[in-house]
Regions:
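Short, exposed beta-strand-loop hairpins at the edges of beta-sheets
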Residues: 12-13, 256-260
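Asp-box/WD-like beta-propeller blade repeats and closely related beta-sheet repeat scaffolds
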Residues: 14-53
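Conserved positions at the start
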Residues: 46-48, 56, 100-105, 175, ...
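Structural WD40 beta-propeller signal
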Residues: 52-56, 109-111, 181-183, 251-253
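Beta-propeller domain segments
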Residues: 65-236, 243, 261, 265-272
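Juxtamembrane/start-of-transmembrane alpha-helix segments at the extracytoplasmic/lumenal side
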Residues: 275-290
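C-terminal membrane-anchoring or membrane-association module
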Residues: 296-312
Length: 312
């Protein structure tokens, strides 16, 4: 088991480092703790980061810019310092991607094996990226789709190539966790990518194209791959009312799990056929399918006076 976090002197205190530990799991407790990666950290923000295992069991993690400005942030000067990158830590390898401002989400497509991430912009340009090997996400020069002028401003980190996001929000939503469904329990959504956000408490669903390297939109407002400030997002909003979502995970049981930081709760999304009629005695709340008033299947449940709705 791998554990990646920013270790500090105390809760909210000075960071000591972004650290990766491995443990053995015997089914009851974690044992044999080993520090395998100790990354530089002096700031309390933009440290990272998600961790993911690909189809070959390689392990990756993402690190934010940590307030640094150097070559890995697309400046012409400054020594690389393991910030604004996706690292492969097992087996060790040079930077998989650079130019990342701040990310809370990594996911591997279970069909294609391709890596995807979410990235938070400053006050614009939140995005979803298809992260190919030697990817340059563009920060601090580019956030959101690039203009020709911005492309010319990239100094160019040898061997790394910039690609536009697969989707961008003009207004910040703080996208976080993302996950694919590969389960017969959600057959309708096998070709979908689910993304959560922290600012609005929304769960988004993006329909993948046949090549699984981009999205299909029916709305003319979203077909330019940008959600402008006044564009309707009804097509992609799958669920609402989750507070600050920090992670979206497809579990080994084939169900979808939503982690809400603000609610202190893990929500499990289940199809009606496996639904339960009451909440289990834990922080996990199970959503039950019910027929909507207009004949559309939806999930509706209430927790802490906030209504949650999911379109199915």
């Amino acid at each position: 088991m791998y554990l990646y976090f920013t270790e500090s002197t105390h809760d909210g205190g000075k960071p000591l480092g972004k650290r990766v530990y491995t443990y053995d799991w015997n089914g009851t407790v974690l044992t044999n703790k080993k520090l395998i990666k100790d990354l530089w950290a002096t700031q309390t923000y933009h440290n990272g980061g998600a961790m993911v295992t690909d189809l070959n069991d390689s392990v990756y993690l993402v690190v934010g810019d940590a307030g640094r400005y150097g070559k890995l942030q697309n400046y012409p000067d400054g020594e690389p310092d393991d910030t604004s990158v996706i690292l492969r830590i097992a087996p060790p390898d040079p930077y998989y991607a650079i130019g990342i401002r701040n990310s809370f989400g990594l996911a591997i497509d279970p069909v294609s094996g391709k890596m995807w991430d979410t990235e938070n912009g400053p006050d614009f340009g939140d995005q979803i990226n298809l992260v190919t090997p030697n990817f340059n996400s563009g920060w601090d020069v580019i956030m959101g789709p690039a203009t020709k002028d911005k492309l010319h401003q990239l100094p160019g980190f040898p061997g790394y190539t910039y690609h536009d996001p697969k989707f961008t929000w003009e207004k910040t939503i703080a996208p976080t966790g993302l996950s694919f469904i590969d389960s017969d329990k959600f057959e309708k959504y096998r070709n979908s990518l689910f993304v959560g956000d922290c600012n609005s408490g929304n769960l988004y669903r993006f329909q993948l194209n046949d090549a699984r390297d981009g999205f299909i939109f029916h709305s003319s407002q979203l077909s330019d791959l940008v959600a402008d400030k006044n564009d309707s997002q009804d097509e992609i909003i799958f669920g609402t009312g989750f507070g600050c979502i920090t992670d979206v995970v497809a579990g080994p049981d084939g169900l979808l799990y939503i982690v809400s930081l603000s609610d202190g709760t893990i929500y499990r999304i289940v199809p009606k056929s496996t639904g339960e009629t009451s909440d289990p005695p834990s922080i996990e709340y199970i959503a039950i399918l019910a027929a909507g008033a207009v004949g559309i299947w939806s999930l509706i449940f209430i927790m802490k006076k906030r209504q949650k709705k999911i379109k199915v």
